């Protein structure tokens, strides 16, 4: 009789364990938003432990089977793939779910180069990476606004839709030299990091309409440029090299002069018949012919 009772008890225990193992079921959303609370429903009875394994951390929750489990925002701030494991009655049950980035809240902005000539097309590049408030890259399309201004006057503006969290653009430099403010921003976002400013120094481009005049003195031919400016009217910086070249029967003479207050001056050897030219970089200016009577 004892053996019969023992056998029945063993069967009952095994049946109960099997029931408990099957009863320890749970359900959760397939996808949630980073930093948002949500609930996990369970079935069965007894105690158990729910473990969440995420990209940045692991959290552990004691549960009463049959009750809902509240998952706090702190447990799901990192976007990515999560594994939820429910341990109860000596058995484990696992499921996966995904945490998606929240709405755009901040961005990282890179601008290149730091120095560009004024009045040039597509010389300034900007790339922005969009993140939510928990530093997750926002893969969903969002809008980034790029603005370029010099001296408080806006010279260019455009909106770019991100692709895989990245927005990229090229901008024309402004027509005037100075410190250009290159700004990337997230429309509607209030975080301080939703607007990032970079400074791009715009300098005068190459010389334009380079012209000179020449005058004979007792000891030399004195050459002098008109004010040297680029095609947008910006003065070339002091120190820019201007090259004067004299060609006559004796050969070639070359003098490099630095611009000072918009003008470059130099002295060339006296000659009875010379051709004098001027250049700055790859830009050629006018040519003069000096004879003995001039």
Language-model region placement:
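The feature marks long extracellular or luminal low-complexity segments
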Residues: 2-5, 18-294
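Bacterial N-terminal signal peptides
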Residues: 7-16
């Amino acid at each position: 009789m004892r053996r019969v009772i023992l056998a029945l008890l063993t069967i009952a225990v095994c049946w109960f364990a099997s029931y408990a193992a099957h009863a320890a079921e749970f359900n959760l959303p397939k996808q949630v938003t980073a930093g948002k609370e949500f609930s996990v429903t369970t079935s069965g009875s007894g105690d158990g432990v729910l473990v969440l394994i995420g990209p940045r951390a692991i959290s552990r929750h004691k549960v009463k089977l049959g009750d809902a489990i509240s998952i706090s925002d702190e447990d799901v701030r990192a976007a990515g793939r999560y594994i939820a494991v429910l341990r109860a009655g000596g058995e484990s049950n696992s499921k996966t779910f995904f945490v998606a980035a929240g709405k755009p809240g901040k961005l990282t902005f890179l601008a290149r180069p730091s120095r560009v000539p004024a009045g040039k097309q597509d010389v300034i590049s900007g790339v922005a990476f969009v993140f939510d408030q928990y530093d997750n890259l926002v893969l969903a399309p969002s809008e980034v606004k790029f603005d370029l201004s010099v001296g408080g006057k806006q010279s260019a503006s455009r909106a770019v839709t991100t692709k895989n969290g990245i927005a990229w653009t090229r901008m024309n430099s402004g027509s005037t030299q100075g410190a250009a403010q290159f700004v990337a921003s997230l429309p509607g976002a209030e975080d301080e990091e939703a607007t990032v400013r970079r400074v791009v120094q715009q300098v005068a481009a190459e010389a334009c309409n380079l012209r000179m005049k020449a005058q004979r003195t007792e000891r030399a031919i004195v050459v002098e440029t008109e004010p040297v400016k680029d095609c947008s009217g910006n003065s070339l910086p002091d120190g820019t090299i201007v090259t004067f070249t004299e060609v006559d029967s004796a050969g070639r003479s070359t003098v490099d002069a630095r611009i000072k207050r918009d003008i470059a001056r130099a002295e060339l050897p006296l000659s009875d018949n010379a051709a004098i030219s001027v250049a700055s970089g790859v830009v050629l200016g006018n040519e003069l012919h000096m004879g003995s009577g001039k």
